[in-house]
Amino acid sequence: KKLYLFPERLRCMFLHLWCLGLRASEVCTLKGNAYYQQGEDYWIQVYQVKMKNYKRIPIPQALYQIMKVYLKKHEIQPEEFIFKNSRGGACLYGTFRTQMIEACRENKIANGEYLFQSHDYRHTVATMFYDSHVSLQSIRDYLGHTYEEMTRQYIDYMPQRIAKANDEFFEMQGSSLASWLKKEEKDGE
C-alpha cells in the first residue's frame, strides 16, 4: 500500500523480489540488457551470483514495461548495472537492505518495526507456484536450484495445508461452533 512512497530505485528493486522471487544479489547485479520480449512473452536474464550461471525466467508485462521506462529515464546502457553503487559498480546487498529498512521505518510499515527479509519473497513465490500445481522440477529450475531438496525447503506448504484442513473440518455439518451453540439452545428448551 505504501510502496509508492519509496524512492523509485527501491521500488523497482523490490518489485523484482516480490514479483519474481529473485535473490537480492541477482537484483543488485542486473544489467540494462536483462529484459527482452519474445513473441508475446516477456523475459529477464539473470546472472545467478551464487550459482555462477545465467538463467532466463518469464516476467509480468507490467514489470517489463516499468523497467523499460526506468532504463530509458536513467539512460542505462545494455552492459551497465541498473542499480549502481556510488562508483558505478553493482549495488551492494548491504546497502540495499539498509535503505529498504530505513524506507520501511520512515513510512511506518508495520509501525516502523518491519524486518526486511529479502529472501522470504523467494519462499513466497515458490509456495505460490506449488499451490498452483506447478511441478517441483519447474519450480527448481525457476529458482535456479541444483537439487529438488533445496526447492522443497523453500515451499512453505504446511501453513496452507493446515489452514485448508481446518476450513474443511469446520465446514463439515455439525463441526462449527455456531452449530454447537444452536444445538445447546435447542437442548435447553
Stretch-by-stretch model annotation:
Residues Q48-K52, L143-E171:
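Catalytic-site neighborhood detector that most strongly recognizes the C-terminal catalytic loop/helix
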Residues P60-E113:
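Active-site/catalytic core of tyrosine-dependent DNA strand-transfer enzymes
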Residues R87, D167-E189:
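C-terminal secondary-structure termini that scaffold catalytic or DNA-interacting sites
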Residues M13, S25-L30, I139:
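Alpha-helix N-cap/helix-start motif at helix boundaries, enriched for small hydrophobics
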Residues L20, T29-K68, E149, E189:
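Conserved tyrosine-mediated DNA breakage-rejoining catalytic core shared by Y-recombinases
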Residues L10, L20, R97-Q137:
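Short, basic (Lys/Arg/His-rich) helix/loop patches that form interaction surfaces
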Residues K1-A24, D41, R122:
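Basic, Lys/Arg- and aromatic-enriched nucleic-acid-binding interface segment
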Residues H16-L17, M128-F129, Y142:
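Short alpha-helical segment immediately N-terminal to, or the first helix within
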